[in-house]
């Protein structure tokens, strides 16, 4: 029986890559499932030798981190794209809209920086990824580009009405949850065909695994847990996830996932 070990990143993994690498060298099937894009995930995971496709942007992408290319992806339907961006614009919000090009590069559209964290997002990534930011007067679908992800960080009260309205749009899934690192919340919108759970199933089929052992910390890991044969919440996970976990393991700051894998994996 082959087990695919699949972990969230923020608040769950992101600490000691060396311990995980040793297990991968010994044959462990390991990857990540995260809301992060290929842009930030590739940089943060550069010290972990992941050869199994990663599930990125909540399942929008199956992504080959080594070769920096998509194995598969789900795009937002055109009608849904314009309906969603209009909801944001009516409330004077400027989300970051991710496009994946036929050339394998990303374009991120935005109209303005409404909060310092939005400029910070831009500054930390500008010139550091395989693609470009594009400031626009209004959101548009560019030639040979496919809309895949719409994201905004803001206060709960600012985002909740947008979340409620966006959920009524066909063809998309809305993920709304608290940020691990700041007092803000994330609203992420993407194709309804995508989810961490669906992505995990696709990876499972690609690598010929029989079972999934999942690790997470936040509400956006609940669907992944519903699919997993074994599910483990780190000690710092939200109560909702700890309640449905088979076991609560060490917190992320103490390398909870890596330490668990060392004990659990048998080459």
Say what each PLM segment does.
Residues 26, 48-50, 58, 168-170, ...:
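Short, structured coil segments at secondary-structure junctions
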Residues 105-215, 219:
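Conserved acidic, metal-coordinating active-site core of Asp-based
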Residues 26-31, 51-52, 148-149, 210-211, ...:
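Short active-site oxyanion
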Residues 51-57, 174-175, 231-235, 249-251:
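Short hydrophobic/aromatic-enriched beta-strand-loop microsegments
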Residues 8:
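Active-site residues of response regulator receiver
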Residues 13-28, 73-80, 135, 191-206, ...:
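Short, acidic loop-to-helix structural element flanking the phosphoryl-transfer center
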Residues 16-121:
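Active-site phosphate-binding/coordination module
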Residues 1-4, 15, 186-267:
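Mg2+-dependent phosphoryl-transfer enzymes with acidic/Ser/Thr/Gly-rich catalytic loops
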């Amino acid at each position: 029986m082959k087990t695919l070990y699949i972990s969230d990143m923020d608040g769950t993994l992101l600490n000691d890559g060396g311990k995980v690498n040793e297990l991968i060298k010994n044959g462990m099937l390991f990857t990540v499932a995260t809301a992060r894009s290929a842009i930030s995930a590739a940089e943060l995971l550069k010290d972990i030798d992941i050869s199994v496709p990663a599930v990125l942007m909540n399942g929008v992408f199956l992504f080959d981190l080594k070769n920096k290319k998509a194995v598969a992806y789900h795009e937002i339907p055109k009608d849904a794209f314009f309906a969603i961006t209009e909801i944001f614009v009516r409330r004077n919000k400027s989300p970051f809209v991710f496009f994946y090009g036929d050339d394998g590069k990303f374009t991120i559209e935005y109209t303005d920086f409404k909060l310092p964290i939005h400029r910070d997002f831009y500054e930390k990534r500008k010139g550091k990824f395989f693609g470009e930011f594009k400031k626009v007067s209004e959101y548009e679908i560019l030639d040979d580009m496919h809309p895949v992800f719409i994201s905004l960080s803001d206060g709960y009260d600012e985002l909740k009405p947008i979340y409620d309205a966006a959920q009524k749009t066909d063809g998309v899934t809305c993920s709304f949850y608290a940020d691990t690192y700041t007092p803000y919340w994330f609203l992420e919108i993407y194709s309804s065909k995508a989810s961490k759970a669906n992505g995990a199933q696709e990876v499972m089929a690609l690598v010929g695994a029989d079972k999934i052992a999942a690790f997470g910390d936040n509400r956006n890991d609940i669907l992944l847990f519903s699919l997993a044969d074994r599910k483990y919440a780190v000690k710092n996970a939200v109560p909702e996830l700890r309640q449905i976990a088979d076991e609560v393991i060490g917190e992320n700051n103490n390398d909870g996932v890596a330490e668990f894998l060392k004990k659990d994996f048998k080459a």
